[in-house]
């Protein structure tokens, strides 16, 4: 089973948790896109949901495939969000934001009664941090903000390169018009403390540490999909 097949397996298992009539947050990224494709097939057969996308990219795919969408302002309370993750640990703490949609992903997930994470087994880690931590910042004062992040990380015993994310045509900009810093801290022994400290930096809009947000994770491997709950 290759990587895409595992993503499809996780998405199939997640789809079993979606009930007709649900207000559904729809994530961003390659695994979430497999979920959207499967959801669209079900919608085409008469299944009723109202989706709230976490990015313009997801919105475009949903509209292309016929998945009905609403804005979060129209549906401010959601039943369930299904989204991918770049890393997930045994306490269901996540690193997200590899696709650049972390702010909207966190807003939508926080507006949901439950969040189910879908991923392949390569994303499961003992300690978060092998994946670069995305930190969304305001463009104004970006150098000062990066310096504040470096000092904060140092106080917590973390160090590593922090770079502005680029795209094919220059600096990457989020859907909200912000920059993303990718922080190569390595292992983050106290993700909870880092999340609190990053939240206190004025120029930080959001960060990719999702703490106490996910309700469960569906992890796909060569033998099929399994469910993780917080240990």
UniProtKB/Swiss-Prot annotation:
Q: What is this protein called?
A: Ribose-5-phosphate isomerase A
Q: Does the keyword Transferase apply?
A: no
Gene from which the chain derives: rpiA
| Annotated catalytic residues | 105 (proton acceptor)
Task: Write down a Pfam family by its short name.
Answer: Rib_5-P_isom_A
* Residue ranges of the TM segments: none
The family database entries (InterPro entries) matched by this protein are listed as:
NagB/RpiA_transferase-like, Ribose-5P_isomerase, Ribose5P_isomerase_typA_subgr, Ribose5P_isomerase_type_A
Q: What is its EC number?
A: 5.3.1.6
Family, per the entry?
Answer: Belongs to the ribose 5-phosphate isomerase family.
Mention one GO molecular function: ribose-5-phosphate isomerase activity
Sorted alphabetically, which keywords does the UniProt record give? Isomerase
| Pathway noted in the entry | Carbohydrate degradation; pentose phosphate pathway; D-ribose 5-phosphate from D-ribulose 5-phosphate (non-oxidative stage): step 1/1
Residues annotated for substrate binding in this entry: 28-31, 83-86, 96-99, 123
A single GO BP annotation from the record?
Answer: pentose-phosphate shunt, non-oxidative branch
What does the record list as coiled-coil region(s)?
none
The cross-references to CDD domains, in alphabetical order and at most eight, read: RPI_A (cd01398)
């Amino acid at each position: 089973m290759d990587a895409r097949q595992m993503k499809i397996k996780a998405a199939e298992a997640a789809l079993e948790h979606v009930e007709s009539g649900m207000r559904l947050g729809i994530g961003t990224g390659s695994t979430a896109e497999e979920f959207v494709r499967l959801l669209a097939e079900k919608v085409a057969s008469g299944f009723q949901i109202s989706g709230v996308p976490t990015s313009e990219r997801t919105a475009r795919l949903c509209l292309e495939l016929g998945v009905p969408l609403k804005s979060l302002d129209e549906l401010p309370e959601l039943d369930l969000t299904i989204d991918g993750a770049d890393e997930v640990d045994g306490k269901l703490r996540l690193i997200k934001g590899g696709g650049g949609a972390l702010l909207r992903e966190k807003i939508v997930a926080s507006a949901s009664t439950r969040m189910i994470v879908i991923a392949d087994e390569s994303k499961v880690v003992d300690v978060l941090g092998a994946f670069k931590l995305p930190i969304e910042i305001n463009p104004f004062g970006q150098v000062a903000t990066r310096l504040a992040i470096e000092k904060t990380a140092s106080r917590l015993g973390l160090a590593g390169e922090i770079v502005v994310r680029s795209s094919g045509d220059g600096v990457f900009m989020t859907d909200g018009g912000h920059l993303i810093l990718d922080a190569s801290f390595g292992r983050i022994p106290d993700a909870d403390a880092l999340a609190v400290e990053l939240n206190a930096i004025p120029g930080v809009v959001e960060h990719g540490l999702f703490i106490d947000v996910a309700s469960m994770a569906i992890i796909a491997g060569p033998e099929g999909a399994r469910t993780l709950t917080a240990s």
